[in-house]
A protein has these predicted regions:
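Class I SAM-dependent methyltransferase SAM/SAH-binding core
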Residues: 46, 52-95
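A short acidic, Gly/Pro-enriched loop at the edge of an enzyme's catalytic core
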Residues: 94-106
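Conserved beta-strand signature within the Rossmann-like core of class I S-adenosyl-L-methionine
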Residues: 134-141
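Short, glycine-/aromatic-enriched active-site segment of Class I SAM-dependent methyltransferases
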Residues: 142-159
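Core SAM-dependent methyltransferase catalytic element
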Residues: 188-203
Length: 203
């Protein structure tokens, strides 16, 4: 099975269970204040790989006009039911149907790590394309070196792929972003995992 189909099938299977494990006061959610403090009210924001919309889209829509993108039907069904105030689009984040210079910010949590790492640079360049000048990107990336790998995740097969922290920071810069901030943060669900969060800016 293609890696993207593994991810799509897996998240469809565990949609409700995964959502139930997420919490609204974890450190990763608190990092969204990095966007709130820098963007005007009602800015246009893309949540790339939004899943069920909880808790990330739900937090963001208090401040911004949010469009969520995901390719897992069950996740989107939950998102549309929970959050009728936001717009949701079914699409692969590596092939998003948006024009250039549309969004004030892109937020992507726990999605880039499921994209084959050889494709991640192109994804970052596409994020840059759809951002307005000086637009922000808050990205969750890998903190350790994991070549394409599959393993059990909450009872289903899942795919991961990412570079180490320093390689990812270099990739963000080489994609055209200025790095404003970065930090490695523990996964709120898996105590053995940690992720690199990066705030980048177009310009």
């Amino acid at each position: 099975m293609h890696p993207k189909e593994i991810v799509r099938t897996g998240y469809n299977k565990i949609a409700s269970r995964y959502t139930a494990k997420r919490v609204a006061d974890s450190e990763d959610v608190q990092l969204l204040d990095l966007l709130v403090k820098r963007l005007p009210k009602q800015a246009m924001l893309l949540d790339a790989g939004c899943g069920s919309g909880y808790p990330i889209t739900q937090f963001l829509e208090q401040f911004f006009r949010v469009t969520g993108v995901d390719f897992a039907n069950q996740q989107l069904r939950l998102a549309r039911t929970r959050l009728p105030g936001s717009t949701f689009v079914k699409a692969d984040i590596c092939r998003m149907p948006f024009k250039n210079d549309v969004f004030d910010a892109v937020c992507s949590y726990y999605a880039i790590i499921h994209v084959p790492r050889r494709e991640q640079s192109r994804l970052l360049i596409d994020f840059l394309r759809i951002l307005k000048m000086d637009g922000l990107a808050l990205l969750c990336m890998g903190a350790g070196d994991i070549p394409d790998d599959t393993a059990d995740y909450q009872g289903t097969e899942m795919f991961w792929s990412h570079y180490d922290k320093e390689t990812n920071l270099r990739m963000v810069k080489e994609s055209g972003f200025n790095i404003l901030w970065s930090k490695v943060v523990k996964d709120p669900i898996d105590a053995h995992a940690a992720h690199l969060f990066v705030l980048g800016q177009k310009g």
